[in-house]
Amino acid sequence: MIGKEEIRRIRELIGAKEGPVLSLYVDVNPAKPENAGRAYALRAKDAMKALEVPGDLSERVLEVLQNQVLEARTAVFFAGEDLFEVLPLQVELPLVNSVKTAFLDEKAGRYLVDGVLAHWGEPFLLPLVYALDEYERYGIVYVDRERWRVFEVFLGEIEEVHDAFLALDTEAWRRLSLDAPGRRFNLGGI
């Protein structure tokens, strides 16, 4: 799950990167018929070829797309000289050709086709920022006879929060309640 630390790391590592970086957003949802047989790899290859991305970067990205099972709906790649990041997202981004907004429109160094958005140049984080902004974090509290559990849901993923509750000894409760400022009125005076 993408947590606050991961978001901070992405912002510092990728956002401040100098030089040309490939920012590639690929719809890899296996439930879609248009992605059968890893067709998304061909669309990504065409996008990188259209942007004239260096061959070594293209090969690294294609190796992941063709040889690894990406358990995600959208795969986000950031690739540069000394940078290679893959972020699997469990949500779908609007990566369709009919969505021609100001930030998804084809410009110099940007290529958009159904299911693939590629950008060659400075890191293009706007679709990722959109996903982080569009989807809210939710908390789920599960209570049974023995314990309480808290789960965090964000971007289609669920993760248990292990340190959500402070464990107190019941003897500490007694001491805390006896030391309360209003105890003299409850216990019959001094």
Where in this protein do the model-derived segments appear?
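Short acidic, glycine/serine/threonine-rich loops at helix termini
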Residues: 88-92, 152-155, 163
